[in-house]
Curated annotation (Swiss-Prot):
InterPro entries: CTT_SPB4, DEAD/DEAH_box_helicase_dom, Helicase_ATP-bd, Helicase_C-like, P-loop_NTPase, RNA-helicase_DEAD-box_CS, SPB4-like_CTE. Residues 42-253 form the Helicase ATP-binding domain. This is ATP-dependent rRNA helicase SPB4. The lineage of its organism: Eukaryota, Fungi, Dikarya, Ascomycota, Pezizomycotina. Component of pre-60S ribosomal complexes. GO terms for molecular function: ATP binding; ATP hydrolysis activity; RNA binding; RNA helicase activity. PROSITE patterns: DEAD_ATP_HELICASE, HELICASE_ATP_BIND_1, HELICASE_CTER, Q_MOTIF. ATP-binding RNA helicase involved in the biogenesis of 60S ribosomal subunits. Binds 90S pre-ribosomal particles and dissociates from pre-60S ribosomal particles after processing of 27SB pre-rRNA. Required for the normal formation of 18S rRNA through the processing of pre-rRNAs at sites A0, A1 and A2, and the normal formation of 25S and 5.8S rRNAs through the processing of pre-rRNAs at sites C1 and C2. Gene3D superfamilies: P-loop containing nucleotide triphosphate hydrolases (3.40.50.300). It comes from Phaeosphaeria nodorum (strain SN15 / ATCC MYA-4574 / FGSC 10173) (Glume blotch fungus).
Amino acid sequence: MAPQTKIDRSFSALTPALSEWIIDAVDAMGFVKTTPVQHAAIPMFMKNSDVVVEAVTGSGKTLAFLIPIVERLLREDAPTKKHHVGAIIISPTRELATQIHTVLSSLLKFHAPSAAMLEPDDEDTDMEDADTPPKPTFPPGTLKAVPQLLLGGSVTPAQDLSAFLKKSPNILIGTPGRLLELLRSPHVHCPQSSFDALVMDEADRLLDLGFKEDLQKIISRLPKQRRTGLFSASMSEAVDQLIRVGLRNPVRIAVKVKARATGEDGKIEDKRTPASLQMSYLVTPPSHKIPAMKKILSSLQPQPQKSILYLSTCFSVDYFQHVLPEVLQGYDIVPLHGKHPDKVRRKNFNKFVDSVTPSILLTTDVAARGLDIPSVDLVFQLDPPSDPKTFIHRCGRAGRAGRRGLAVTFLNPGREEDYIEFLQVRQTPISPLTTPEITVTDEDAKAVTSKIRKKVREDRALFDKAQRGFVSWVRAYSKHTASSIFRIDDLDWTELGNAWGLLTLPGMPELKKWQGDKRLGIELDLATYAYKDKAREKLRLEELERDKEEGTKKKQHKKEDREKSAWTEQKESKATKEVRREKKKSKREHERLAKMTDEERKEEDRVQAMIEQMRKKVAKQEAEDADFEGFSD
């Protein structure tokens, strides 16, 4: 057998050759060689080919489309005309769009003309020192790449248009809605002579979030003669439909990881996650999950600096962000979910990314796709995702770009263990967590539950958050797509209450038939349970006093109300019966008339006329009798 030829995966070995400044840029960014997806996609996209790229999470898709876009724009015969667009990159989320823009800006800092456009205008900055070097200038015909980020929620569409007219960017990056807003302006032009490339990143996510109509409208505004790249971690029927509409004879690139099976057959099987990522599961009761997570964090060497903990709902995040610091001491807990205002989301995301101390991002699926969080060591899934497709995207936050990572999914004993086989069928095999070896005792679980409850007792606001979060979690669990595995009827409510550190189980339909202790063996006087916030506590006490006064009045009028109610109900009942009787009578009469022949109906009309005539005669006689006052004396 002939020896295999070693492939040169350096960026300088790509064909067509990359510009020297691009090679310098990726080298400075720490990328020594191309990933498989970059090695396959960059040459094809730089040529005149549409590409459909299916690659595992964390495979370097972002540079795989940014490098070709920049190279193509900077190799044009003339610079892009003013207010003309050369390329558009569509992202499903604001966070992902922001990261794409950040990576592109880092790349363009190595191209002097483009880097000059990234700097703020002189009028937007304070007066500079005399020693500050002047801003470099370039001839009018100099080619450059100028990006603009378009995000809903942060600035208005009018501000986006103002920035576009001022800077005249030729690369637009944003979410579908805000991109479409800008493209509708008569001042924004995408003619065939200028427009070069369209990229749809995380295409399946774009469709899952309901952006199909916006995507079609964007595509309809672009010239058909263009290069199009569709990048995604998975393919679906909806994505295939988008490919048929938006791409012309695309080159399909599927980059998967090959892993040798552990069975005796020695088969080679495809994996949809990086080889550097270890995906494991731990079967443990609900109240043991947080203690187990604590032991995993303390057992790993070196200590994980960045970890992600996934929960199923926003309200769950709102609750656990307050109680987990009591248990996971030494870690910064950073919350991030879709209901946070845009400024809060950006602030918390940047706080986690820039953190230099051990941190845990507490989040929902808003961070499961596309977010390029560097150096994530560990991913926990306290709740398996409701959509199985999301599983690999959650796990894929760790083990990116060849870095070793660990993803641990917690499962309840019993039916939930079927989830393991469920994932294997979908080419996502997971193995039991053996390293580190974790053992949690009932005493460990009780100690953690006690700490959480102690924290919750300090402030009634946490009690409210716990109740709301638990109800939202139960509803999310009941809507799991793998409903045969995740069943409400199989839940141990006492275990769950202890796992959450609840002081009492909330009143909800799922617990109506449950015969257990909803107070969880805890004494709690809600009348004296106070809010830490003085204004909120004052309002609660006022409402409590008002309820007491209304309760006294209700007792005084209870008997009277009951008597009135009984008499009223009796009268209403009689009237209701009378109305019902009349309706039945009318219905029977209608049915009787409907069955008559024409002759019978004529006879009926004649009889009714005679009866009516007789009624009038009798009524007239009664009126005359009423006027008669007797004989005079």
